[in-house]
């Protein structure tokens, strides 16, 4: 009598270890890139809030001949829409103002070291956005 042996199918331990190493390497590359992309996309939350505050400052100046030093007097929120940034007016007078978006501590955006704060400075009719690399224009 001839016995037929069934061939076992499956992965060997070595094959599984190789697959795990490949997954680990891909994860080590992909995760930091993903996190950087998320931080960059969340900066839009700050730029939108700063642009809105800029418009409200100009509207306020038409009626008051000076820029406001208070977010509440221009009708703007001190927090960005998604809550990742705090918006403030650093200085304001008749010809210029500075708006600043600072990441809220304890939120994921607080670890954004590339663009820790975003600033718009309006001076004599010219707007300056800094850091320039953090503004997608």
Language-model regions, residue ranges each:
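Membrane-proximal N-terminal amphipathic helix
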Residues: 36-66
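Residues at secondary-structure transition points
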Residues: 8, 40-44, 48, 92, ...
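Short coil/loop residues immediately preceding or within conserved phosphate-binding loops
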Residues: 8, 20, 96
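A short, glycine- and basic residue-enriched loop/turn
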Residues: 8-10, 23, 41, 64
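Periplasmic/extracellular, small/polar-rich flexible segments of pilin-like filament-forming proteins
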Residues: 61-137
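Alpha-helical hydrophobic helix detector
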Residues: 16-33
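N-terminal leader/signal peptides at the extreme start of proteins
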Residues: 1-11
């Amino acid at each position: 009598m001839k016995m037929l042996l069934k061939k076992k199918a499956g992965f060997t331990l070595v094959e599984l270890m190789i697959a795990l190493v490949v997954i680990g390497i891909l994860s080590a590359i992909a995760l930091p890139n993903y996190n950087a992309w998320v931080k960059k996309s969340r900066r839009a939350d700050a730029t939108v809030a700063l642009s809105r505050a800029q418009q409200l400052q100009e509207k306020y100046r038409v009626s008051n001949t000076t820029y406001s030093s208070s977010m509440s007097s221009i009708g703007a929120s001190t927090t960005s829409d998604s809550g990742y940034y705090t918006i403030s007016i650093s200085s304001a007078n008749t010809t210029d103002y500075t708006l600043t978006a600072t990441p809220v501590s304890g939120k994921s955006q607080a670890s954004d070291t590339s663009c820790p704060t975003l600033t718009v400075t309006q001076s004599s009719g010219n707007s300056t956005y800094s850091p320039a690399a953090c503004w997608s224009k």
